[in-house]
């Protein structure tokens, strides 16, 4: 066989090659038909495919074997070798070993089969015939001697083997008979009976070399393997022979009966799994996937599918090369953080949901931005008709009107005048920086050199602000330069801050500018991106007129139907830094900018047309910077606006640089604009966000809406360009994309963004947590923080959703939350070991803790030797690498010093007899724990040790080096072991005073010493065994000492006594040789007097003293307590008595935190460390066991152990700050129309009597163009309304329940869309304002304004008097929407067990209906028609489970169409449960009640209240106390079968005194005839801005004149709605809200906050300002007393008080409906100054953001945050509110609140 050695050499060279062989060389030998090549290659290929398959599926060999337990691993012909290797292996290692044997067998089989073959004769030795009938193959073979049937694939597919020339003749004959004949790529006589003798010879060879050639026996088979000869299972055979024998005989000499094998398999599958009829074949090999005919299985009615492994692996697992750091350009820039707001997406994660679904966010223009019907521009002139008909489209962000002004320290008033672009930039800047980890250590005062570059152009909000009078905030809020300046100012940066305007390319140009600034050293870090928020209409008109905008809706990039772009909102910012710095800092690198640049298309045919040559040049430039070849760019994110001119030009540029027939893979192209529109100046950054999302998920999304290629664009496929139409894997060896963006003025920008470099991760960090897989139970400390509890819960909820969906590692989540996110004052901590426990913990968060502003001092406490074991739990040593390092380090030093190892001893549970091992081991454990805490970042203020522990403390504080300390401990222990006397000494701890202790010693009269003075009543005695026994006897028998607690100290020797003296001389010699240093941490020695501090605080003599003299531990603790104040006493080590000893020694234990670590006798000792971390966090300490215990030494490379990952951004608590656009021309037209109407030019329609309506709600009017603006009438005279309201009496006043408003809204929505009834119904932000009763003299209206989403409205319920058209009273507001079905299964599973726990809890209290409603009657009296609670079970005043039934007395439902899905009665009974829970709790005093004031969210679905079978529900309610007067409730409603149909979250209750509530309800007049409202005293000139952006609390007062004691008629307010009560009782906790107080005549001055001193000051001020003689000693305890005294004097001295000639309007409303409380400010009005002060505080709050409750009279305006701009605005506000004028010198930052009050009061009386 001359060819044999040559073929083997080919294999050797191929396997050994360090470089790939040339293609021609490889093709030469792999094309050879020789079995010596084909069979080994087949074995290699199939084994490799097998491992690729396992890797792709992320399963193990044993898991796969279990999956194929029935079907097994079967091999056809040569495939039997790898099949046997796999089937006989228990794990991957055995597969590799057996594959090696199979490979040798394959080579040998090929060699034996080719014996005597002439390689010079070309052609195969095997041919496959597709015969026409059974037996035809036998007929043909009989005609050609020397040929044999080698394999039967199926009855008609037969393989024939024979000599080359004979086989060729046979093939020609068969084809002549019309039979298809296929040559096999194989030479050699396989499956040939002529080989029987050769086969025996081969088998003998195998026996000679069993380790190389013998596979395991059939007994080793882990799954089914069948014989190619018989088709039967080999596993069931009795043979003990090697599988190699079976393979050799089948392959060399026997016919392959494959079809029989399949028949046997089908029979067994049918018999074994009769219930499972579907099976899959995983097919490995070269492409002969037709070798598994389905006929045998179909006969058994089995359904077979085939999985081509080659295709499967290629599809799922393209080899990922990745790149190491050194393979990136030297100046590459890392993207380490990102924040975005794009239509429908508030984060990159939400953006991916839109991209992957290929969805579009286009919609018609939102009326909330501006109402086109009110816009005058374009309404006249030649284009008026066209403008009126044109439909405007856009892609909009939600809630741009709102902003978390408190979070950013901006006053509400200033926020209202800020362009929403500035506000959103602040939010996204925070998110990008927080995600990058920058904010974790950021301090504004550091003046960091960080750059800020913003791409922006439009300032459309200027159209809104220009509708109002100018303010000091308008310029700073709308000038473009402040978009970057605002960010830099907020964070206190010194780096360059620039706004860049290049039109649509601006944001990517800003990124280029940032990259260049970092690369040039101008700044080490930068924030870059862009913004575009649509708030004005004029750009729509201008761009539309210029032909830019699509008339049909969304952008359609590259599509035949492209007709222009669709405008969009968008904001995006990325945090950038040098790639090498980012990797060094352990940042989460989201993507790498490998090349970036800009240029200009100055030679374009028109200024708005892109120039292809400029784009080509730019692409080549950035490609060259990246160091990549064009073929390595596999995705291009195009500008792609969807224009007929721009798209073809851009494609041609891409084709020129990145396309070409020589590419090895397609380059996909897309454009974000197809999903979210064209965000103009933010378009480029939006495209970059898309690429970052693609890199994160490793997929390429479809181009949304793409149908057919624009005919102007030549075919893409010839140049390997492709537009994806479905979601696909990004299967490139290195993922890199080009992002392109060009501006309408010719400015181009592009960049290359690649994936992050490979960072080698450490995989042996925690042996118990192999590779950190979440299957382990290692606990991780969780840390979540926010500025308040609302955002804390929102952050937790968002994080839980993300974790459930994305399944990150718990370790990475915990690490990122603590190490890479900013810490806020409200914090929550918890533990989790897996995702389930993580989500469970997050879902349970109710409120956080406010960390102490000044954390306590930390003291490390080291115990003495209190036992004869060390007690290190082995799990600590195994699980905490850094702890292990320090113990190992100590052990190495001990061994180096010549002593035995300490490692067995540290774990021992039995007493350690070797004193050296005991004490060195104790030292090592204490030292390791202390060092780990210090490495964790714990700031230790002092260390103290008891007895032996002081030696460890010396090492930890670096008083002694570690080696010196261990030398001392080991040598000392050796002396103890060798030099100690015969009496070891015994120690006894007693709890007695020093006098009692000394008395005991005197009575015993033995040589007993006090070894330890541990505290005032804690001492340790030392003596001989006999003498200590006498002490114990004395205490037990002598009545003087009986009851004195005592216990033996389990120490090896009696230290601090005369027993130590034999070792002292040599110990002193040792000490003198040690080097003592000044401690790096203050060391408090346990001495009677403190050791003088100095360069060497501890002298060598201390060592002998320490051993011989007593331990004055109590004195040391007292000194520390006096010096440091409240402390955290932390044990160094575990399971020692040190912390209880410290606690007993402190004078005031309640001031301290005692943190002892108990690991013994608990189920999970390793939980002690993360639990201790939580305690330290709760105390405000900055400490991380990630850096300490969990990390590897010496530098704690946690970045390679715990990954900094992307997590959902901070959830802001936004409130509305918005100036609505007003067209001044339109407003003027309205004024003219009103004047004409007043002059009689417009007739009036006489009121006609109306017949009672048939329905509760009827349509009244709607917008002429759409259903976006609707008005309905709510008919309060219907029987349904009156019956329900009459049944719902709050303190005997019939009031409309909240659920009635909801039913009316749903009924109205049904008129718009009948399908509302089968959808999920959602109510948000319900607020209840003016109460609504039964009053037939009032018109009740329902207004519904569309908010831009389909079937979503903002609604208002209000009423006006029928006779007088005064100001309407608002009763309720909220948002209603119809949504798709929501999956409640998670809630159902979570709450089912919780409800059962409450029902069976021993502390639960169960109330039946009668008792429940009796309790409730103090708040609400319910008639039978509203009594649905049959029983309720309450636990701890916080949880309740109630059974609710349909009330027995029914209410008419014929007047409503919404009863089935939103029944007022049923919903009210649900809400009653949470109301009863809250009002029956101990937090509600008997003279006060909790009233519902709003609901955050209600979701209902699958409700059918009209079905008689649905008459019982189970309601779970829980209450959370927000403050003393504010409680929030949540409720969940389940059907009888456990289905969740209703959720209500954030039901807000506020507490009111019953007397006050009754007086208010009596005064509101909603159940009686209305009074005439007060009109405004003056008419404003022009249009003024809203006075406040705060929450609106109305005092809709009807005024009446009442005589005072002087006969004067004074105007007083008698009607107040419920929201006024909220303002008084709960709003004081809202920094931006009103702080108005109800001051009644019977109000006590003390309750108003006036103590004896302030009352004296108050009276003196009144006397000085009003000229009244009021004695400070007079009893003026109530307002009435003060009022009477004032008027008694003023009736004779102040004639002006008899005239109401100066009325001040004090505005208490927000922007939507200014309402005035008209109060005469005169010297005779006793309450005027208080009202003026209150209003002054409100104005200061509006302009500073400071809470009213924190503003004191003596503070200046500057002290409360008023700056040079806001003082101008504040001055104008004062002048408007109080009708006074200030000179410039009168109003400045120096003024105090008291001075302002005095000024206004004096001015008012002039």
Swiss-Prot record:
Keyword Metal-binding annotated: no
Keywords, comma-separated and alphabetical: Methyltransferase, Multifunctional enzyme, Phosphopantetheine, Phosphoprotein, Transferase, Virulence
Family annotation (SMART domains): PKS_AT, PKS_KS
Domain Carrier, residue spans: 1727-1804
Stretches the record annotates as Product template (PT) domain: 1249-1558
Cofactor(s), by name: pantetheine 4'-phosphate
Pathway annotation: Secondary metabolite biosynthesis
One annotated GO molecular function: methyltransferase activity
EC number(s) stated in the UniProt entry for this protein: 2.3.1.-
Residue span of region Malonyl-CoA:ACP transacylase (MAT) domain: 860-1156
Protein's recorded name: Non-reducing polyketide synthase pks12
The organism of origin for this protein: Talaromyces marneffei (strain ATCC 18224 / CBS 334.59 / QM 7333)
